[in-house]
């Protein structure tokens, strides 16, 4: 049986599956021995009062193994011999446009006037040290776009539209921690 629950736990309980199961058993009256797996679907911090709590939305597997993957894996087709499409810019929009083109069976050719991230670091240090700006390689132009040197915090005001879940799945498929799927404000 698969059930969904919402729990309000202390921070020290959230990172141990057994602690979550024990809390669930006590709070919801479930026999902890029957819980085979707990998957955290959403996690947020409630720091409005003196005691900080973590709000969890969880999927609980009772007497059965988990049936789903943590994230959806996209299988990209081979497009080496397909028609080319030019994508301008290697920022987030260009990279996701390229992935979508591959899904649709096209071969993207990405054009970027800036440098790769490692070379951009050198150019950015020149901006701060001697105020020398390279018009082709700076905070805005180059691999990763303007977000390459951000703090990694992604915010969206949209909860009901857009492809937020798909984008987070793509990040996980390419090496991001699966915790970003559960965190309300993921740090990527």
Model regions: which residues?
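Charged, amphipathic alpha-helical segments characteristic of ABC-type P-loop ATPases involved
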Residues: 118, 124-125
């Amino acid at each position: 049986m698969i059930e969904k629950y919402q729990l309000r736990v202390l921070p020290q309980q959230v990172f141990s599956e057994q602690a979550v199961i024990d809390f669930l058993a006590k709070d919801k009256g479930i026999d902890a021995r029957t819980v085979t797996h707990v998957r955290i679907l959403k996690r947020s911090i409630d720091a409005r009062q003196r005691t900080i709590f973590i709000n969890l939305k969880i999927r609980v597997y009772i007497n059965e193994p988990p049936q789903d993957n943590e994230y959806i894996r996209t299988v990209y087709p081979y497009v080496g011999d397909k028609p080319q499409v030019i994508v301008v810019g290697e920022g987030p929009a260009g990279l996701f446009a390229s992935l979508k083109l591959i899904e649709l069976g096209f071969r993207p050719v990405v054009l970027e006037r800036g440098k790769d991230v490692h070379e951009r670091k050198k150019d950015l240090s020149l901006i701060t040290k001697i105020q020398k700006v390279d018009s082709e390689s700076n905070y805005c132009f180059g691999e990763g776009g303007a977000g390459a040197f951000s703090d990694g915090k992604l915010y969206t005001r949209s909860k009901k539209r857009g492809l937020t879940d798909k984008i987070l799945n793509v990040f996980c498929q390419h090496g991001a921690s699966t915790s970003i799927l559960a965190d309300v404000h993921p740090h990527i």
